């Protein structure tokens, strides 16, 4: 089971007065619910946990490793995110190309990327959506 530690974590958006200040939180349960009102910082927290945003202060540790020190590919192997609104997530014209883009973040052989993307789509029943 993985553990997530958040120590004195802060992030402030420049365009608005918002601050997420998390102090010494440890999550080791198999399932944790993050709840709060709109604008409370749930999405910001997950963007910090996936490396889409970088905290101004504090440390994120996953399984004892400082997440901020990991390379982008190492972060991708530890944490993933699916956005509520797919328009915020998908950039490629087809499902296959979107999955290939994700695979290409951890390898560079084109044939292997295509093969792995198609296998992933087949596993989730989307292999008919490749065009």
Residue ranges, per PLM feature:
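The feature captures the beta-strand-to-loop junction immediately N-terminal to the Walker
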Residues: 35-37
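Conserved Walker
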Residues: 43-44
């Amino acid at each position: 089971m993985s553990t997530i530690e958040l120590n004195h974590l802060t992030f402030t958006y420049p365009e608005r007065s918002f601050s997420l200040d998390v102090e010494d939180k440890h999550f080791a349960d198999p399932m944790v619910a993050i709840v709060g009102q709109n604008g409370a910082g749930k999405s910001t927290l997950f963007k910090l946990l996936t490396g889409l945003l970088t905290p101004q202060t504090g440390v994120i540790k996953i399984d004892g490793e400082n997440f901020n020190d990991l390379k982008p590919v190492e972060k991708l192997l530890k944490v993933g995110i699916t956005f509520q609104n797919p328009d915020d997530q998908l950039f490629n014209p087809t499902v296959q190309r979107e999955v290939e883009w994700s695979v290409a973040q951890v390898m560079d052989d084109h044939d292997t990327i295509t093969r792995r993307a198609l296998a992933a789509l087949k596993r989730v029943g989307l292999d008919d959506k490749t065009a």
